[in-house]
């Protein structure tokens, strides 16, 4: 956090090694894409985490290293490999916002055809995206009245620790008293946990029920906050976070669609018949709707959960969003078409 305020923090050797591995992976991908083709090239990059003040680096990252000069490092490596860029990397965008942009512009995107939709992606972490009144809104633009999922806790448990693929693995490790690294070494991730639940294993069923309950809680809060304003339903990981405003310009808006993507979406798709996650999710959401003190909300959404929710198979949504943002920025600077 101090780094974002302009106070450089020495990056540890371990972080440097992790950052170098990420840099080499990016370089390898770019070299593969550009092999045998002529440039110059335009590159868009989306990353999780808090960005540096110039938006060219990562100042803080829950599941990875700080990389304060990442964009410049990438440009330097590309130059060494004679990869010409049409323009410098304009910024490291939000992978979450890019998910929304990809869902809006992608051929099979699920933000199309509706004016108001919420997206939740679950992978290494969690990603939020929101479309209101026909516009995809960056979450940083609405942070005064809506929190990102990773910021929120319920009953002392972080939503990211329950709804991300990595968090679900950690919950299963806790239930089975198995070290997380052992599960990773065995390739035991969310799909395997769901298979265990479908086979009736109590520990896996408990984890799936926990996922379903928290997903129902979160989706109701999103709907409620958009329609009514923040109701203090959850707590924050950071107790010093400024309070959310209870009023905003979009109040009275009904969400038309929930979109669940990435590995969490895949798990829900695989669970559609077995209902290990679905039943608890639907029950929790419907219960909150039925007991809502906001009459219009209750009238509009009673028994509608399954009609609202759709699963995205657009795993490339954030990549597509990054490309669109880079091209849009380039066009605005050069008036290219």
Q: Where in the sequence are the language-model features?
A:
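Glycine/GP-enriched mid-protein hinge/lid loop-to-helix segment characteristic of carbohydrate kinases
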Residues: 1-18, 73, 77-80, 84, ...
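Glycine-rich phosphate-binding loop and adjoining helix at the ATP-binding site
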Residues: 2-31, 36-116, 142, 269-297
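Buried hydrophobic side chains on well-structured beta-strands
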Residues: 45, 215, 258-260
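Active-site metal-binding loops of divalent metal-dependent hydrolases
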Residues: 96, 124, 264
């Amino acid at each position: 956090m101090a780094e974002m305020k302009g106070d450089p923090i020495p990056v540890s050797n371990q972080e440097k090694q992790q950052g170098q591995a990420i840099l080499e992976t990016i370089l390898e991908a770019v070299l593969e894409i550009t092999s045998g083709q002529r440039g110059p090239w335009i590159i868009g990059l989306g990353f999780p985490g808090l960005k540096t003040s110039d938006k060219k680096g990562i100042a803080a990252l829950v599941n990875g290293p700080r990389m304060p000069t990442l964009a410049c490092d990438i440009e330097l490596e590309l130059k060494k490999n004679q990869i010409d860029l049409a323009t410098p990397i304009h910024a490291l965008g939000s992978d979450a916002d890019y998910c929304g942009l990809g869902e809006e512009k992608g051929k099979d995107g699920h933000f199309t055809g509706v004016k108001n939709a919420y997206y939740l992606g679950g992978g290494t972490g969690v990603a939020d995206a929101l479309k209101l009144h026909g516009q995809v809104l960056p979450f940083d633009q609405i942070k005064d009245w809506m929190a990102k999922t990773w910021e929120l806790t319920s009953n002392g448990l972080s939503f990211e620790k329950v709804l991300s693929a990595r968090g679900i693995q950690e919950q299963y490790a806790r239930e089975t008293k198995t070290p997380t690294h052992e599960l990773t070494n065995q390739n035991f991730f969310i799909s395997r946990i769901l298979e265990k639940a479908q086979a009736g294993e109590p520990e896996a069923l408990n984890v799936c029920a926990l996922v379903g309950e928290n997903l129902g809680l979160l989706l109701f809060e999103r709907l409620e906050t958009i329609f009514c304003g923040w109701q203090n339903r959850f707590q924050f990981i950071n107790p010093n976070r400024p309070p959310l405003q209870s009023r905003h310009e979009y109040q009275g808006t009904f969400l038309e669609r929930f979109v669940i993507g990435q590995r969490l979406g895949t798990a829900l798709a695989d669970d559609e018949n077995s209902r290990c996650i679905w039943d608890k999710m639907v029950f929790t959401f419907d219960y909150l709707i039925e007991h809502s003190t906001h009459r219009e909300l209750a009238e509009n959404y009673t028994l509608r959960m399954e009609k609202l929710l759709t699963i995205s198979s657009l795993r490339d949504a954030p990549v597509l969003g990054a490309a669109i943002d880079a091209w849009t920025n380039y066009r605005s600077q050069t008036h290219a078409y």
